[in-house]
C-alpha cells in the first residue's frame, strides 16, 4: 500500500525529510511538498529527484500563507500523514488541517505555546499525533528504537 505524505515546509529540513522518506522507507511513498515559496518548492523537488534512486512520485503544492487553497485541500484529502516542517508559529494551523482532513500528524517544533495548542487540538483527532519529533529527542529515539530492534532480531534478546 502506498503511503502519501504531505511535508509542510520545503526548506532545508523539509527537503531532507522528503529525501530520507523517499529513499529509505521500507514501504512505497508518494511525497507532497508544500511551501509558500515556489522557489523553495522547485529547489526541494530537484534535490529529492537528483539524490534518490527511487522513482516514487514527488509533487509540489504552493501553499497559501494564512489560509488553505484548492491545491492544499486536494492534497490533504489524499494524504495519510502531514509532516510539519514549517516554522513553529505555523504548527497549530498545520495540526488543524491534520484534524480536519483526518491525517496523522508529526511535527518538529519545540515551541511550548504551540505544542500546548496542538495537544488541545489532538484530543478530538481520530488519527495519531506525534509532537516534538525533531533531532533530539525525536530522531534520537527513532534511531535508538531501530538499533534496538536490529539487536533484538540478531541476538534474540
Q: What is each stretch, according to the model?
A:
Residues 108-129:
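Rossmann-fold NAD(P)-binding glycine/threonine-rich loop
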Residues 51-67:
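Rossmann-fold cofactor-recognition segment
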Residues 65-77:
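Conserved Rossmann-fold cofactor-binding substructure of NAD(P)-dependent oxidoreductases
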Residues 127-157:
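Rossmann-like dinucleotide-binding core of oxidoreductases
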Residues 85-87, 97-115:
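ADP-ribose/adenylate-binding Rossmann-like module
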Residues 36-40:
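Helix N-cap at the beta1-alpha1 junction of Rossmann-like dinucleotide-binding domains, i.e.
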Residues 14-15:
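N-terminal Rossmann-fold NAD(P) dinucleotide-binding loop
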Residues 5-11:
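Conserved N-terminal Rossmann-fold NAD(P)-binding element of oxidoreductases
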Amino acid at each position: 500500500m502506498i503511503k502519501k505524505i504531505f511535508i509542510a515546509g520545503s526548506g532545508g529540513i523539509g527537503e531532507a525529510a522528503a529525501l530520507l522518506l523517499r529513499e529509505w522507507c521500507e514501504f512505497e511513498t508518494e511525497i507532497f511538498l508544500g511551501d509558500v515559496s515556489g522557489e523553495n518548492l522547485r529547489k526541494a523537488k530537484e534535490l529529492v529527484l537528483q539524490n534518490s534512486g527511487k522513482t516514487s512520485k514527488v509533487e509540489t503544492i504552493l501553499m497559501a500563507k494564512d489560509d488553505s487553497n484548492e491545491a492544499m485541500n486536494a492534497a490533504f484529502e489524499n494524504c495519510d500523514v502531514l509532516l510539519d516542517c514549517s516554522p513553529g508559529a505555523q504548527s497549530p494551523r498545520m495540526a488543524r488541517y491534520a484534524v480536519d482532513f483526518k491525517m496523522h500528524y508529526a511535527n518538529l517544533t519545540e515551541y511550548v505555546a504551540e505544542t500546548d495548542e496542538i495537544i488541545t487540538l489532538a484530543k478530538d483527532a481520530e488519527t495519531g499525533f506525534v509532537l516534538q519529533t525533531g533531532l533530539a529527542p525525536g530522531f534520537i529515539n527513532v534511531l535508538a528504537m531501530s538499533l534496538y530492534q536490529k539487536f533484538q532480531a540478531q541476538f534474540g534478546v
